[in-house]
């Protein structure tokens, strides 16, 4: 379905969770650090005192660097990214003390190149939280109503939410965005 939607378009960086279906859609992938922090906290709560606590600290450091990107030079960001990669290598050499920590470390070894892409790509966020917040109303609607009775209803609802979310990004109310779209003047995201 995603391939049908994107067609030949391939984003430079795809921000995603660690789900296999989220791999390969962009030239590069940035994993959501918020999800990884949650996974690390689960490992800590399950008793890991080896890998997970240090991994949490490393992710928080990366997020802090990311928040400072506007004031840092590209060369400085590249140095920070290389430093984060070196620290990750050292962390991956630490033996986790609980099964949840071992599982987390195995998963991170498989996707280690996807953790710090955002450091050197200024327009890439460290998390996909904004996207998930945009999906939340649809998820709530589906849970409350039990879903849609027709494909037409689902498409219409998705289109309306898309117009509203795009309008919000451009400082318009839901009503303004819908009125403009229905009048044939939709807000277009620049190519």
What are these model-predicted stretches?
Residues 1-191:
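Catalytic center-proximal scaffold of phosphoryl-transfer enzymes
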């Amino acid at each position: 379905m995603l391939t049908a939607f994107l067609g030949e378009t391939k984003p430079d960086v795809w921000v995603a969770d660690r789900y296999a279906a989220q791999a390969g859609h962009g030239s590069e992938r940035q994993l959501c650090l918020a999800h990884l922090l949650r996974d690390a906290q689960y490992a800590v709560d399950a008793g890991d005192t080896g890998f997970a606590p240090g991994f949490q600290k490393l992710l928080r450091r990366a997020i802090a660097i990311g928040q400072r990107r506007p004031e840092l030079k590209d060369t400085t960001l590249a140095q920070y990214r290389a430093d984060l990669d070196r620290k990750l290598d050292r962390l991956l050499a630490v033996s986790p003390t609980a099964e949840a920590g071992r599982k987390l470390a195995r998963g991170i070894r498989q996707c280690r190149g996807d953790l710090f892409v955002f450091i050197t790509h200024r327009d890439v966020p460290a998390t996909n939280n904004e996207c998930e917040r945009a999906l939340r109303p649809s998820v709530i609607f589906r849970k409350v109503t039990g879903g849609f009775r027709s494909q037409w209803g689902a498409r219409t609802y998705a289109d309306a939410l898309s117009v509203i979310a795009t309008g919000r990004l451009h400082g318009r109310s839901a009503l303004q965005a819908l009125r403009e779209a229905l009048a044939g003047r939709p807000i277009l995201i620049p190519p």
